[in-house]
């Protein structure tokens, strides 16, 4: 039974707002102008605007006015081993708004073999009744079963879902084979969907986990040791290769290592439509914490793919983000409490995976990229909002300050200092992986659907005020190029006459012959090796020989063989 939408849950009442004296920052331009908001939309942009009386005025005083952030990688209320992630849709979206994010795309994670449609309705209802900001939903394909194609069609055509995640890891749980990935990519391309990939080599991870546990390593460091970055990079390369054969766009989630990022950057230079998403954690911290003597601290960083133990990785990923080789920043927000993480205290494979970042994402990106001079303000807007809106077909409704766009607006103070700490964050967990980090850049005012939801450090939201935002298939930012490439690079056979020559008759035998028994499998039937020591054999060249009485001819040197000399290159 499908969820019919929330009942008697009041949406926020839009205010008439005038933002004066701000500097509008979009991904492609900046300008000084006032912005008038009404009925949840941006109505006017310019100077000396004529607005109705009684309008609330916000003085920006030259500060940046940017589109609200879009976090396309969250796992609120995700189930794991009978537990649920600590932040539900209320707590998670509340934290998002405080950090300047005004829309999320959350992952629906069905139990393997269960209905995608049923799971979607379950997530939709939970988000609709609790979310404080606008949201949409990815649907993860956790198994490739009979009937999945029909459900995917319904989700795309009737439910407003245009993005699906597949897994190359989690052997015997979520993992798909290469042939299944090929089938899924082909089918999803036909639907005009965005294909998200969790890229890790699940087969090798399973072997490494077994080996490391047998060595007696059970702590969080085992998580990183069993998932070296080569296994992420190999899977990224494989996913891009499969997508390239089909000519479909592919979006790599949670880029955590230099190797994986390099493969994405190189592939983009060669032409495949691939997009890479580092998360706040991989940009703001590293995997050296897995070796902390404090088990709870080490476990807090457990996520997959793991954070790189190389402390230079965050700076490297930030540089690739700044130059466009990586395009979007997510958070991968899926925190579990310390008590929940402790389920794996004696076995690192049982530690629930996930870190925080939904509140910290935009501040971390500003501090690591813009405040260091790697990235300008326009690029900041692109990687935190606009690129995501374009890829997932939300643009220009989201991701832009323009007349007609949704009134999701942030007044950003680039000079504001903020120390990240679990004592003041809005997440329900008692730790923060960015604990003690002092960052430049933070929102002063956050406006969602035309109403002020965060101002002067105070959050003012209600459960259920967020809206589900449906997304249409075939986002132009991706599929415009796909359509052209289908025409230009389509496969064509060679026009030739029919072959009418002889055809060898192949005997009707089984395709695969039974292999001969080996020494290991049938030692009793195997003959002893021949004797190579001539002293132990009855073979001799001394004494009388059987042909001693035959007449012998004098040897002659053959100048040319019978029939004359041959030419090895001649067939005549």
From Swiss-Prot:
SUPFAM superfamilies per the record?
A: Composite domain of metallo-dependent hydrolases, Metallo-dependent hydrolases
Motif Required for interaction with FLNA mapped to chain: 246-247
Subcellular location, principal: cytoplasm
Q: Which GO terms describe its cellular component?
A: actin cytoskeleton; centrosome; cytosol; dendrite; growth cone; midbody; perikaryon; postsynapse
Q: Which residues carry this modification: 3'-nitrotyrosine?
A: 316
Q: Which InterPro entries match?
A: Amidohydro-rel, Hydantoinase/dihydroPyrase, Metal-dep_hydrolase_composite, Metal_Hydrolase, Metallo-dep_Hydrolases_sf
A biological-process GO annotation: regulation of postsynapse assembly
Q: In which tissues is it expressed?
A: Brain.
What positions are modified (Phosphotyrosine)? 504
* Keywords for the protein's UniProt record, in alphabetical order: Cell projection, Cytoplasm, Cytoskeleton, Nitration, Phosphoprotein
Q: Where is the composition biased (Low complexity)?
A: 513-525
- Taken from the UniProt record, the cysteine pairs bridged by disulfide bonds within this chain are none
Gene3D superfamilies, per database record: Metal-dependent hydrolases, Urease, subunit C, domain 1
Mark the residues carrying the PTM Phosphoserine: 8, 521-522, 537, 540, 542
What segments bear the compositional bias annotation Polar residues?
A: 534-543
Molecular function terms from GO? filamin binding; hydrolase activity, acting on carbon-nitrogen (but not peptide) bonds, in cyclic amides; identical protein binding; phosphoprotein binding
Q: How does it assemble?
A: Homotetramer, and heterotetramer with DPYSL2, DPYSL3, DPYSL4 or DPYSL5. Interacts with PLXNA1. Interacts with FLNA (via calponin-homology (CH) domain 1 and filamin repeat 24); the interaction alters FLNA ternary structure and thus promotes FLNA dissociation from F-actin.
Q: Which family does this protein fall into?
A: Belongs to the metallo-dependent hydrolases superfamily. Hydantoinase/dihydropyrimidinase family.
Q: What does this protein do?
A: Necessary for signaling by class 3 semaphorins and subsequent remodeling of the cytoskeleton. Plays a role in axon guidance. During the axon guidance process, acts downstream of SEMA3A to promote FLNA dissociation from F-actin which results in the rearrangement of the actin cytoskeleton and the collapse of the growth cone. Involved in invasive growth and cell migration. May participate in cytokinesis.
Listed NCBIfam families:
D-hydantoinase
Name of this protein: Dihydropyrimidinase-related protein 1
Question: What is the gene name?
Answer: CRMP1
